[in-house]
Curated annotation (Swiss-Prot):
[4Fe-4S] cluster 1 binds at C11, C45, C74. This is Putative methylthiotransferase HP_0285. GO terms for biological process: tRNA methylthiolation. It comes from Helicobacter pylori (strain ATCC 700392 / 26695). Belongs to the methylthiotransferase family. Its EC number is 2.-.-.-. [4Fe-4S] cluster 2 binds at C144, C148, C151. PANTHER family: RADICAL SAM PROTEINS (PTHR11918), THREONYLCARBAMOYLADENOSINE TRNA METHYLTHIOTRANSFERASE (PTHR11918:SF45).
Length: 418
């Protein structure tokens, strides 16, 4: 039986998609060791030029090692054809065909099967296990109806559509019966869940919270305008993580307008302050170097960031994506300036995060942590605020949910003895 190795690039949604493919392998075995594999399946990411480059380099490397390489994911539409025509890939298949992976691997001839985004495909596979077992990523929707000027993802994932609530509940219930204690709700635009089905993410979360064995629910990312009063009521519940990732993308209205974003700084501030008042950690995304971000604009944006109650951030340098409105804008920012701004933001939020952790210690807030892995005599865990903890213990703690009352604040994480 031939062995298959999955190489997954990019987001949590891709991690779930890889599990869907793995679940559908009937005549092949999987391996976690790249060198053992006869077949390499690349689940690609195309969110930035850097992501494209990493995927391309890996595909070429595997082809040179005489591996049979198949290619799927968001990169199918941006570079799948080029890599296929140059002979690096045996086969290319879009998102619609993930569940046909077993048959595709048995094809003798080379093949290229693109996505048809008009058919609004949703997978039907039930994932029976997840790597790690204590935490699982659950895809609840696919696609995005936002039209942000810089973003290529709607053109490779299609318009927003939601999985049936019944299927999601069944999927989570199955995984929890096998030891999963925490789920992370993922998708292309998670907060749009239910819009096409007369529901919303808050109602889904309430129903998920009733599943036996599920102790904590995390949410991949939300847009500011997707957080309504019904969702805010959930902030009082113990089953919801005490960390929300809210995608602002910038903190200056001029840039939000240039990006064709739906949020604005005044309402963003009001929302974040409301959430922070419930003792929540808050993360966001931030794009530096988008066309139009002059020095004075960034200076004002940085001052706004300083005053926001943020604890986590995923900042990245603007990446020019072909055929997007932003790619036609001419008032670009130098890479040197973009890197300086990126580092300034990272440093700012690093200090905000440490201050937040110190405040929790001062308030005697116990950390509720799910222990994931053991390495070098220490256990690693994530607390309710999405902060890492290193735990020293002689006990078999893996997969345990702990309440840690005594801990130390270190530079980038907390330490505890249990």
């Amino acid at each position: 039986m031939k062995k298959v190795y999955f190489k997954t690039f990019g987001c949590r949604t891709n991690l779930f998609d890889t599990q869907v493919m793995s679940e559908n392998l009937k005549d092949f075995s999987t391996t976690l060791e790249e060198q053992e594999a006869d077949i390499i399946i690349i689940n690609s990411c195309t969110v930035t030029n850097g992501a494209d480059s990493a995927v391309r380099s890996y595909a070429k490397k595997m082809a040179r090692l005489d591996k049979e390489v198949l290619f799927t994911g968001c990169g199918v539409k941006t570079q799948g054809k080029e890599l296929f025509e140059k002979g690096f890939l045996k086969g290319v298949f879009g998102h619609d065909n993930k569940e046909k992976i077993n048959a595709l691997l048995q094809e003798k001839k080379r093949f290229f099967i693109d996505d048809n985004l008009e058919n609004k495909h949703l997978d039907t596979t039930m994932v029976s296990e997840f790597v790690g077992k204590t935490r699982a990523f659950i895809k609840i929707q696919e696609g995005c109806d936002f039209d942000c000027n810089y973003c290529i993802i709607p053109s490779v994932r299609g318009r927003a559509r939601s999985f049936e609530e019944r299927k999601i509940l069944e999927q989570v219930g199955l995984l929890c019966s096998k030891g999963v204690q925490e789920v992370v709700l993922t998708g292309t635009n998670v907060g749009s869940y239910g819009k096409d089905r007369g529901s919303n993410i808050a109602r889904l979360i309430k129903k998920l919270s009733q599943i036996a064995g599920l102790k904590r629910i995390r949410i991949g990312s939300l847009e500011p305008n997707q957080i309504n009063d019904e969702f805010l009521e959930l902030l009082e519940e113990d089953f919801l993580e005490k960390h929300l990732h809210i995608a602002l993308q910038h903190s200056h209205d001029l840039m939000l307008e240039r990006m064709n974003r739906r949020n604005r700084t005044k309402s963003d501030r009001e929302l974040l302050e409301t959430i922070a008042s419930k003792n929540f950690a808050i993360g966001t995304d931030f794009i530096v170097g988008h066309p139009g971000e002059s020095g004075s604009v960034f200076e004002k944006a940085f001052k706004n960031l300083e005053s926001l109650p943020l604890t986590h951030i995923h900042p990245f340098i603007y990446s020019k994506r072909k055929d997007t409105p932003s790619s036609l804008m001419t008032d670009s920012v130098s890479l040197e300036d973009s890197k300086k701004r990126l580092n300034a933001i990272k440093d700012l939020i690093f200090h905000k995060n440490k201050a937040f952790r110190q405040l929790q210690l001062k308030l005697n807030t116990p950390l509720k942590a799910l222990v994931e892995v053991q390495k070098d005599g220490e256990f690693k865990a994530l607390d309710q605020f999405f902060n890492p903890i290193k735990i020293k213990s002689d006990k078999p703690l893996r997969a345990s949910f702990l309440e840690i009352k005594e801990y130390e604040i270190k530079e980038r994480e907390n330490h505890a003895v249990f």
